Structures are given as C-alpha cells and as structure tokens.
Design a protein with these regions (language model features):
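Negatively charged
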Residues: 1-178
Length: 178
C-alpha cells in the first residue's frame, strides 16, 4: 500500500534508506515497501516489534514475510486496545522464542492460535500473562514438544474460564514456575 501524502513517515528498514516505511492510519500501523507486490521481509528478531503500541486495534500481516524470524518475544506485549489478532499470515515455523508474546494484551477477547507453527518453540514464559479479556483459550493445536520454559504462562489471566491443557506436552519443560 502506498503511504498517504499527509502521513508521518517512520523509516523502519535496516539500512535507513526508506525502502520500508511505517505510518499510522488512525489506530492501524501500516508497514510497506512502497513497491507494489513486494513483501516486507522481517529480520530474525521481531522482539518488541509492536510492544506497548496501546493505540493499535488491528495488524494486517499479509504483506510481512516472517519465515526467517526466530524471536517473537514481547512482540505484542501491552497492545491493550486489540480485541482480536489475526495470525493467519504469520509464519512461525522457525520461531524458538515466544515468551511474553501476548503479555498484558488485556483487550484480547479472541485469539485463534490455529495458524501458529510452534514445533520449534522452546520458550513460552508468560506467553499469555495478564490477558484478562480472554475467557477461552484453545491450545489443542499448539505443538509444545520442544518447549523447556513455561513459567508464568497464564499468570494473571483472571478472565480465563475454559483452559484445556490435556494436549499440552510438557515432557521437556524444566521451568513451570509462577
């Protein structure tokens, strides 16, 4: 998408040449290569990418290639106004760290984890901590066979009334502390 003329530009690419830019469109942060048909390729770390962007209501990942990402820790932490997050286009096949990924996303009332490939994830510490708006969290599609850290994974999730842990493989977990 081409950035509107009146928008305030934020240069977000690695070399600072303006090849990838971001701007706010109301409550939506948009990121673009400014080249039609070309995706933004994320670095290996998306740590804190949207952290404490409290005005964000939605994020469209259809133009972001995350296939090389290994660290998504704190990625959405503190995005308090988001009520739902569409993870359909988020490629997580190489991610090893999802700690604090949704921490303090207090507005989330719906979170479909089905699109996430968590087969390589080892750290899920505080992944859903303080997601007070979630009443139901379906973990049946999460592959946790390689996870070693699950400390405080659901800490402070005071709204959770339905949480089925029967499919959670904790055989390699060494830290489940609170």
């Amino acid at each position: 998408e081409i950035m509107p003329v009146a928008a305030t530009l934020i240069d977000v690419d690695a070399d600072g040449d303006g090849g990838v830019v971001a701007w706010m469109d109301g409550t939506v942060m948009k990121v673009s290569t400014q080249t039609p048909g070309k995706q933004v390729i994320a670095a290996t770390s998306c740590q804190e990418m949207f952290m404490i962007k409290s005005n964000l209501i939605s994020i469209d990942f259809s133009n972001l290639d995350t296939s090389n990402v290994i660290n998504m820790s704190h990625m959405f932490e503190g995005c308090t106004r988001m009520t739902a997050l569409d993870l359909t286009h988020l490629d997580t096949q190489n991610v090893t760290n999802m700690s604090h990924m949704f921490l303090a996303c207090i507005g989330l009332t719906n979170l479909d984890l089905t699109p996430l490939d968590t087969s390589n994830v080892t750290n899920m510490d505080s992944m859903f901590g303080y997601c007070n708006g979630l009443t139901n969290l379906d973990l049946t599609t999460l592959d946790t066979q390689n996870v070693t850290r699950m400390g405080s994974m659901f800490s402070g999730c005071s709204g959770l009334t339905n949480l089925d842990l029967t499919h959670l493989d904790a055989s390699k977990v060494t830290d489940m502390s609170y």
